[in-house]
């Protein structure tokens, strides 16, 4: 009897172990670990399969509601088609306890992109500034704040954030400083504040002599104040320093030379441009027109 009971106990134990093994095996097949699923979602994102990635990420958060990074990526994917939903998801993550500094940065970064997507630049700016309270030298945040300031045409802020960015990177770009002075000058020009605009354009030139836009718009100021000689001088400098964009003042230069009785200098101007950039199509065409007006062969271009 005792032997029968013992045998029965052994059989029951083996059966229980078998059932447990089957259950665990079945569960592992039917419910893959969330880290594996998350990797699958990332792979789907890389392939551009957003629908599959969303489906997998929803499966991840259903299995593990504490998988913050899965929620984060889910919101990032939804941003393009359902930005409000993305914002709700990302905002809900800000109150999660025990978040690492890295995770907090990623959440605020996601929200900054969300708000920028819907044109809420004030909130986007606040989120980027939140990142700087966590990481004072965060390059992404500083670049983002520069971009936001430029989009809002807030040139003082753009210049300020640019200087902070340059301090962090250790790379000073005088063209950036000059660019914002030019933008300030353009604001003055729009408001007919010619003297203020002139000072800012001159400041831009002094800051970065090789940055062409300062010369272009300083020429425009002189044009409005009827100082055609100085206007011409600055336009020509701009055209030679910005070979790609200089064509925009070619017409002004031709008109100024004509009004000054110096139209014969047009040919030399375009030849100078072609010495600097032999493939400048606009200069080639205009020089051909000048030669044609003079009755000279286009072969004289050579």
Predicted regions and their residues:
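Short coil turns that delineate tetratricopeptide repeat
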Residues: 65, 98, 102, 136, ...
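Register position in tetratricopeptide repeats
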Residues: 46, 80, 117, 151, ...
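Conserved structural position within tetratricopeptide repeats
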Residues: 61-62, 95, 129-133, 167, ...
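TPR alpha-solenoid repeat register
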Residues: 70, 103, 107, 141, ...
């Amino acid at each position: 009897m005792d032997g029968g009971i013992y045998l029965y106990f052994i059989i029951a134990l083996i059966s229980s172990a078998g059932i447990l093994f089957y259950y665990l095996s079945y569960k592992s097949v039917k419910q893959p670990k969330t880290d594996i699923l998350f990797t699958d979602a990332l792979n789907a994102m890389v392939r551009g399969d957003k629908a599959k990635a969303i489906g997998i990420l929803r499966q991840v958060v259903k299995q593990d509601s504490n998988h913050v990074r899965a929620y984060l990526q889910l919101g990032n994917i939804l941003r393009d088609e359902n930005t409000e939903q993305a914002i709700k998801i990302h905002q809900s993550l800000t109150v999660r306890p025990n978040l690492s500094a890295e995770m907090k940065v990623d959440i605020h970064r996601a929200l900054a992109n969300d708000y920028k997507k819907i044109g809420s630049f004030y909130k986007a700016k606040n989120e980027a500034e939140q990142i700087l309270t966590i990481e004072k030298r965060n390059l992404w945040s500083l670049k983002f704040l520069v971009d936001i300031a430029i989009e809002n045409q807030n040139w003082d802020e753009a210049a300020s954030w640019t200087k902070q960015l340059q301090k962090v990177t250790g790379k000073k770009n005088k063209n950036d400083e000059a660019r914002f002075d030019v933008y300030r000058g353009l604001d003055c020009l729009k408001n007919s504040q010619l003297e203020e605009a002139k000072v800012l354009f001159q400041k831009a030139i002094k800051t970065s002599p090789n940055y062409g836009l300062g010369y272009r718009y300083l020429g425009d100021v002189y044009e409005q104040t009827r100082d055609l000689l100085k206007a011409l001088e600055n336009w020509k400098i701009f055209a030679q320093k910005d070979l790609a964009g200089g064509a925009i003042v070619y017409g002004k230069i031709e008109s100024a030379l004509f009004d000054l009785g110096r139209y014969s200098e047009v040919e030399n101007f375009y030849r100078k441009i072609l010495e600097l950039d032999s493939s400048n199509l606009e200069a080639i065409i205009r020089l051909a027109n000048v030669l044609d007006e003079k009755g000279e062969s286009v072969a004289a271009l050579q």
